């Protein structure tokens, strides 16, 4: 029995070592959504350095029942690219326009385009004055979100509380589960974060400057159905017309995937080329349509570092600034168009 106990304890020593390594090195150095999703210890220095450039306060107001009847010049509806707080494009736009912006959380399992239709049909927009409403949708979900819009849906509920509960539930995992996830992901098994080599340093990081980390779902374009593309484009036109019929100017912005923006700079790229945004070229002549890749790709090509965050799937404050300037131009054009 004693020998068995000694052998059992001995067998657990490697696990103890791994747990201690995770506690004292891996966990404290997780940063960015890609770092947390992929259990990659990027460290905190990069995020801390980037954070020193953020605006000091946010002028983005979250929609609640209490401010339903308030008047705002600009309203925004979007996914995680529209929930970036002080470093988000809305905050820079708010400062350029010198006005607060009202942001609507997208409904769980709904998406920004459908949430926008729900708000329009339920009369929420009729209670608030908007000069313009901006709908933002990330590229990897663009076709699905647009092609599945139900234009007859009138239900809307503020999803902020439920959303936070869902996020808390997803973020909370038993400690050992995190350890085993790190071991599994470190072995490359079913890792949702991909890594490729770039032809130059596109990020201000001594360790990962020439590496591109991106979300596996950035490759979801490989399964796009052509019929869904046709429906998506038709629905986008219909959404714009519906807002116009209510007297509301609309801007539809696509938040380009990180992989799409950097794919031309990957050495020996093992993945196919993403051409999703090519399907929407016929919309580029319209002032209501904003393809953020056209704004951000030239920055990367000209050597601007950290257009997107090295350790995150989202763009940085640098991109937010440039996107905000473009949105300001579009708002001016639309405001002077009958």
Regions found by a protein language model. Give the residues of each.
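Extracellular glycan-modifying ectodomains
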Residues: 1-338
């Amino acid at each position: 029995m004693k020998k068995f106990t000694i052998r059992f304890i001995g067998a657990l020593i490697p696990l103890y070592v791994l747990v201690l390594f995770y506690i004292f090195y891996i966990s404290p150095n997780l940063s960015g959504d890609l770092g947390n999703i992929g259990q990659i210890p990027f460290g905190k220095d990069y995020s801390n350095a980037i954070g020193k450039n953020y605006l000091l306060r946010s002028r983005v107001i979250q929609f609640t029942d209490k401010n339903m009847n308030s008047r705002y010049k600009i309203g925004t509806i979007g996914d995680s690219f529209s929930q970036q707080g002080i470093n988000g494009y809305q905050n820079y736009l708010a400062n350029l326009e010198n006005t607060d912006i009202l942001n609507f959380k997208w409904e769980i399992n709904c998406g920004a385009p459908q949430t926008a239709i729900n708000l329009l049909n339920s009369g929420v927009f009729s209670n608030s004055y908007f000069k313009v409403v901006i709908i933002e949708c990330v590229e990897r979900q663009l076709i699905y979100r647009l092609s599945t819009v139900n234009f007859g849906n009138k239900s809307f509920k503020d999803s902020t509380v439920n959303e936070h509960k869902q996020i808390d539930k997803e973020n909370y995992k038993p400690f050992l589960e995190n350890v085993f996830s790190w071991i599994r992901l470190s072995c490359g098994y079913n890792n949702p974060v991909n890594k490729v080599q770039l032809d130059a340093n596109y990020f201000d990081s001594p360790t990962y400057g020439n590496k591109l980390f991106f979300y596996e779902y950035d490759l979801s374009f490989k399964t796009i159905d052509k019929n869904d593309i046709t429906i998506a484009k038709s629905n986008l036109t219909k959404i714009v017309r519906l807002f116009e019929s209510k007297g509301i100017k609309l801007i539809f912005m696509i938040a380009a995937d990180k992989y799409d923006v950097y794919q031309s700079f990957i050495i020996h790229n093992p993945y196919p080329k993403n051409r999703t945004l090519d399907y929407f070229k016929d919309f580029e002549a319209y002032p209501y349509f904003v393809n953020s890749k056209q704004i951000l790709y030239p920055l990367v090509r000209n050597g601007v570092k950290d257009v997107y965050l090295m350790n995150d799937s989202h763009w940085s404050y640098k991109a937010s600034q440039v996107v905000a300037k473009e949105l300001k131009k579009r708002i001016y054009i639309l405001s002077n168009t009958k």
